[in-house]
From Swiss-Prot:
Gene behind the chain: Slc5a6
Family per similarity comment: Belongs to the sodium:solute symporter (SSF) (TC 2.A.21) family.
Glycosylation sites: N488, N497
Protein name: Sodium-dependent multivitamin transporter
Subcellular location(s) per record: Cell membrane; Apical cell membrane
Record's subunit section: Interacts with PDZD11.
Amino acid sequence: MTVASTAAPSYTTSDTNRVISTFSVVDYVVFGLLLVLSLVIGLYHACRGWGRHTVGELLMADRKMGCLPVALSLLATFQSAVAILGGPAEIYRFGTQYWFLGCSYFLGLLIPAHIFIPVFYRLHLTSAYEYLELRFNKAVRICGTVTFIFQMVVYMGVALYAPSLALNAVTGFDLWLSVLALGIVCNIYTALGGLKAVIWTDVFQTLIMFLGQLVVIIVGAAKVGGLGHVWAVASQHGLISGIELDPDPFVRHTFWTLAFGGVFMMLSLYGVNQAQVQRYLSSHSEKAAVLSCYAVFPCQQVALCMSCLIGLVMFAYYKKYSMSPQQEQAAPDQLVLYFVMDLLKDMPGLPGLFVACLFSGSLSTISSAFNSLATVTMEDLIQPWFPQLTETRAIMLSRSLAFAYGLVCLGMAYVSSHLGSVLQAALSIFGMVGGPLLGLFCLGMFFPCANPLGAIVGLLTGLTMAFWIGIGSIVSRMSSAAASPPLNGSSSFLPSNLTVATVTTLMPSTLSKPTGLQQFYSLSYLWYSAHNSTTVIAVGLIVSLLTGGMRGRSLNPGTIYPVLPKLLALLPLSCQKRLCWRSHNQDIPVVTNLFPEKMGNGALQDSRDKERMAEDGLVHQPCSPTYIVQETSL
């Protein structure tokens, strides 16, 4: 749908003469305050101690951050505008089954707190991909880094453009004005202020996100008769879903899909994603990092609850006040904005507050992307090749990288404007890549016999499967003549006397189930991470064992999950040998506090480097203990 965007007081679309609600001056002021305050916070941290900044302070906030700001930043990083718009639309169209996603948050945050954080924190890393070099080799590290850069570069442009497009279509808010304003402001405070500025602006933006959604819930519930009436209307029309225990992984949303498939999605975000790992490592202690992960749990539940309540309030509102034909045909990501403009049109400033809430989600996501991309580029791709960089030049280069990625983001936003139907494919790339990266880290932490070749082949296979299923699913849906109807009884193409329960009953008999490759492509998106990470682990293990496992290689004990030695000690000796856990019938020393160091050439130094240097007479201190693993094959 083409939208005319001008300076006139009202806007119309090319396919309808209906006047679109517009922003008042007060709304623009409220939205502008978000940008100004975010910029002020960033510039404050940039100017504070100017001239005394270090690379560690710029990229890692000097590793002195407290639990609460890190927790709110962790929440804000992936609480994007897409989630703020998509969650309520999901509830409005398909019912409350989506709410069970909250069940996945417990394990999805408990596992990172007690498995990934201890390993990463005790290795004293800056980039999560440094772990891959310590565990495998430099080639695996570069593969992981390049994969992450591709994932984030594609996503951040779409994450900036998509909400701006939805806002423009509904309110007439100038598309490229919002894109440029957000991109430039985010670019400035991220490049100059570093991670500390990003974290503290995330705190501010999280509060704005909660406030904006809370206002919509309160005002909307008041207009339709209270939350009790909202729930009664939703229940009357079958919108309140029971627990769907169908184990079929090809059903889009069931309890098992949401509660367990969602765990793997959470692990790919909160376990191994550089943006989140960087925040854990910026904490002043390992305990603070773990507590910040705990603190995200109630915050995530509140965010999910508010998102779902907005969907229910929206449903009750449009049962009382009818939709216009344009709204009935609107894209799902526009429904919430139409609702907000209808609900708050007589309250100047409140539409601006919700838009500030919406773009707070975008700012937090994009700034995290800029900062994490600058960090991995500096640590994984530049530092090893230019080891003689002075502190001053390293700081300038780090800031330049963040600024450069900001320009790339604006460029990707422009590219996104020409993608058309491929836009959904670009958004899906973020989810496709997360699963294989999760599998790569799990392969290293839990399987001592995995070798570098197995890791690389496993990652490439996982990525191939991810793109095959993901893109195949998108193409299949686009080419399908009959799409599943939304389950809300108010859509223009459903009879008014049908409810969610009625449609749900009719669907099995009216819609044929896909077969063959079509069924394969219909795998629920929440199982993507589980499927792709499992593929990486399975293929990685098979290739590793076929190629001799860790034949004659030393294994840095700090790269293995600390509890794993105790668990493997319970296995028979023959199993321990096959898993590379015993060498020459002797116990292998377990050391979990082994810290990597940076050598003069910018590369990582661990116990293997120290051994070689000791043999060459370059160092005289004792070598740190390592695993020497035996030959292993099938």
